[in-house]
Amino acid sequence: MESTSNPTVSFLGIDFDLTILAMSLLTITIIFILVFWASRKMTIKPKGKQNVLEYVYELVNNTISQNLGHYTKNYSLLMFILFSFVFIANNLGLMTSLKTHEHNFWTSPTANFGVDITLSLLVAFICHIEGIRKKGIGGYLKGFLSPTPAMLPMNLLEEVTNVASLALRLFGNIFSGEVVTGLLLQLAVLSPFTGPLAFALNIVWTAFSMFIGFIQAYVFIILSSSYIGHKVHGDEEE
């Protein structure tokens, strides 16, 4: 397999991945355009594109309500944005391939671990902020000593593993999907005989990858809402 890398630019001694930045911006732009288009001329009785938008929003709302309860309305928009970003980002790499012998210019943003860990850290940051807002900084920090002070290392480790598992699960599934797609594209140009087989396999794999992309976005908001719910429901569960 040919080795290609994403073009980068250095700023203040930090290398920025131009492909990932561009694809992330494209993902955000697609979300904005779709939501803007679907929400134009909204009616009391939804139909067509408005119906699809409301269905997705209700799907997210119903999913996170299991973990957030009466706090659902406070986080429904955040979870809708997270779901939309992860789902579209997961599937961008399936649309086409754009590369030279040296550089790759098209990929799924979530096939990059930096994007996934950033999303996970964002969720963790919100969890801690909401925990402090709910219990106060003293009460929140005291929670790390529950049920006994001896549990402090385990409670801290749990916070780290939550972030790592959220990022690694997403990265592993999407990155491996792009690797298989790349192998099928190479199989297509290997010989005239493997072309039709690769084409058929690629159609099946693309459909399967889109399904996996949806499942990963769905799991991402389930886990994110679960982590946030644990922080805001802490006192109520005790």
UniProtKB/Swiss-Prot annotation:
The chain crosses the membrane at residues 18-38, 75-95, 112-132, 179-199, 203-223. InterPro entries: ATP_syn_F0_a_bact/chloroplast (IPR045082), ATP_synth_F0_asu (IPR000568), ATP_synth_F0_asu_AS (IPR023011), F0_ATP_A_sf (IPR035908). It comes from Streptococcus agalactiae serotype V (strain ATCC BAA-611 / 2603 V/R). This is ATP synthase subunit a. GO terms for cellular component: plasma membrane; proton-transporting ATP synthase complex. F-type ATPases have 2 components, CF(1) - the catalytic core - and CF(0) - the membrane proton channel. CF(1) has five subunits: alpha(3), beta(3), gamma(1), delta(1), epsilon(1). CF(0) has three main subunits: a(1), b(2) and c(9-12). The alpha and beta chains form an alternating ring which encloses part of the gamma chain. CF(1) is attached to CF(0) by a central stalk formed by the gamma and epsilon chains, while a peripheral stalk is formed by the delta and b chains. Belongs to the ATPase A chain family. GO terms for molecular function: proton-transporting ATP synthase activity, rotational mechanism. It comes from the Bacteria. Keywords: ATP synthesis, Cell membrane, CF(0), Hydrogen ion transport, Ion transport, Membrane, Transmembrane, Transmembrane helix, Transport. PANTHER family: ATP SYNTHASE SUBUNIT A, CHLOROPLASTIC (PTHR42823:SF3). It is a multi-pass membrane protein. GO terms for biological process: proton motive force-driven plasma membrane ATP synthesis.
